[in-house]
From Swiss-Prot:
Coiled coil: none annotated. The keyword Methyltransferase applies. Signal peptide: none annotated. Belongs to the diphthine synthase family. Homodimer. SUPFAM superfamilies: Tetrapyrrole methylase (SSF53790). This is Diphthine synthase. CDD domains: DHP5_DphB. S-adenosyl-L-methionine binds at L9, D84, V87, S112, I113, L169, A210, H235. Pathway: Protein modification; peptidyl-diphthamide biosynthesis. The lineage of its organism: Archaea, Methanobacteriati, Methanobacteriota, Stenosarchaea group, Methanomicrobia. GO terms for molecular function: diphthine synthase activity. The gene is dphB. It comes from Methanosarcina barkeri (strain Fusaro / DSM 804). It is an enzyme of class 2 (transferase). It catalyses: 2-[(3S)-amino-3-carboxypropyl]-L-histidyl-[translation elongation factor 2] + 3 S-adenosyl-L-methionine = diphthine-[translation elongation factor 2] + 3 S-adenosyl-L-homocysteine + 3 H(+).
Amino acid sequence: MLTFIGLGLFDEYDISLKGLEAIREADMVYAEFYTSCLMGTNLEKMEKLYGKKVFLLSREDVEQHPDWLSKAKNRNLCFLTGGDTMVSTTHVDLRLRAEKLGIDTRLIHGASIASAVSGLTGLQNYRFGKSASIPHPYESRRGTRIISETPYDTIKQNLELGLHTLVFLDIDKEKGYMTVNTALELLLEVEEKRGEGIMRGAAAVGIARAGSEKPVIRADYAENLKDFNFGKPLHILVIPGKLHFLEAEALVKLAGGPVGFMKEVE
């Protein structure tokens, strides 16, 4: 049996009682934190709470050489991830591979950043469109700096439909955790190149350390928000579409947004 367990948003105490019980009953416990991680804890604290050794897996261990998976044929294994399990396609792929090997799988869900963002900002969850991910820029073989324009396109499509866009920010082993500030700078750089008027004057909301005792939620126009200090990671970004009057009021009162938002409601 392979049990996928979502650990929630911030620290070791975000796990559900059902998830904690499954870990304590498992023969072996594995975890990956390259798709998401808990910034308010570490492996030592997790192991102390769980009463179990946790084996940390790399991207290669999960996606390319999951030799450990075969152990689940005759043992109870747990696979831990930040947030809610199965949000990442990597985890869906791993589950399908387990099923093909004849391994039974089980899911134990955890708090998701998608639902947390709605709660923290006051933006209604059914008004979100397709999400986007902003990767760090990279250099081509010729040394040209490449910025992905896919997130810009996704935001554009959602805005045309009046929908909000949840924008995930890159976690890179070498380049580190992308900030809201960097993400907005990259989107504005694409805007400067394409000149389609998507980001200039657009509203934006940044969230830092969701799930902690003192998360930071700040709303403003993108050009202003890029200069706000959100502090330590993890960060996530929202580009709102058309605002319902309750959403606009929430952004002003709960996220310090400008009163001008109240004039832009449906």
